[in-house]
Structure formats: structure tokens, C-alpha cells
Amino acid sequence: MIGARVFKHSTVERMAKENQVPIINLLSDEAHPLQALADVLTMQQELGDLQGRSVAYIGDGNNVFRSLALASGFLGMEVRFSGPSEYFISDEDRDLSLIHI
């Protein structure tokens, strides 16, 4: 297993395609899954079951938001976002929390 902390997300994708071992994205410009995992584990530790709860993200629509929205949606949480208009989220990112895999 290889943990990759890279700038470009395409680097992680290329590594996964070219290697025989699993590649874990530790951080890229598109995603920060370990931060999302730490956030939801902390929320779960403090609040218990997260199903039906809401999480508010205030900031710019970046890799941290993207990963938190996906993780929160997977756990059945409602995601709310607020931030400056010049750093607002895309429609695709807005819909991430609606994806229940």
C-alpha cells in the first residue's frame, strides 16, 4: 500500500493505474479524504450516530469541502455551505452530499 500526498489529483490517478499495490490519496488538489475521515470520526465521537444530522462548512469550496461533503452524505448527513462568492462551490460539488454510495 502506498500513501500519496500530491498536488495534482491526476498524479494519484496515474499512480493507481501504473502500480500493482493500492494507492491511498492522502491529499490532492481535488480531495483531502483523510481530513474528512478525521472530521467525521470526531463528530461521531462527540455526537454518536450522524444519520440525519447537519454539518455546516464555512469557507471556500475546496478539496476539504469536497471530501467532507462526500463523507457526510455517505453517512446520511445534511451538508450546508457558506462562503465568499468568488470561492463558491460548483454545482457538481454541491451535489456530492446527495451521493449515497
Where are these predicted regions, by residue range?
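Solvent-exposed alpha-helices and their adjacent loops that cap or buttress functional pockets
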Residues: 15-18, 46-51, 73-74
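Active-site-proximal loop->helix
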Residues: 13-14, 18, 70-71, 89-97
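Loop/helix-junction capping segments adjacent to catalytic residues or to phosphate/diphosphate-binding pockets
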Residues: 9, 33-34, 62-66, 88
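Structural motif
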Residues: 1, 21-24, 54-56, 78-80
